[in-house]
């Protein structure tokens, strides 16, 4: 399958490498790899970004060992971050809307490919809607992100309300946003 990378005129083939140039003329190379399930559905397993000099700058790896608790490893430059994206067992919301999880399009370097993610050019979305993103090591600031969905009478997602809760030294602060969807 061939998918068009929507920045510039380059083309990507699944399980391949894409190269693009930013406005400053820097070349960035992205390599994608996929987990293919028994139904021949592709799930993005890894994206790696390399700079002009061939040095790895960033990556995201998604472990699908448990589809209700996806393990995400992210590295950007020298910063590494691991988290778990969960949906409660027995209370799953089937992703019949086939939308990607918001955290996927928020994490660099995948944030550079949001249109391709929504277009399913970079693989299928999770089978269940993710309801919580929990960092492994919160350090000084405890943080969780909770996702709440509004569905229409067909079970199609019409909105996702995300709340990022930071707790530091007993002080709580929430950052909220709502993304509305129109799916015909």
PLM regions: where:
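A short, structured loop/turn motif at beta-sheet edges
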Residues: 10, 34-39, 65-66, 149-158
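A structural detector for short beta-strand units
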Residues: 9-10, 25-34, 54-62, 77-91, ...
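Short helix-loop boundary/capping segments
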Residues: 47-122
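Beta-turn initiation residues at beta-strand->coil junctions
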Residues: 17-24, 28-31, 45-53, 71-78, ...
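Hydrophilic extracytoplasmic domains
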Residues: 119-123, 138-184
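Hydrophobic alpha-helical segments, especially N-terminal targeting/anchoring helices
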Residues: 21, 50, 63, 135, ...
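Single conserved hydrophobic/aromatic residue that forms the stacking wall/gate
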Residues: 1-8, 12-15
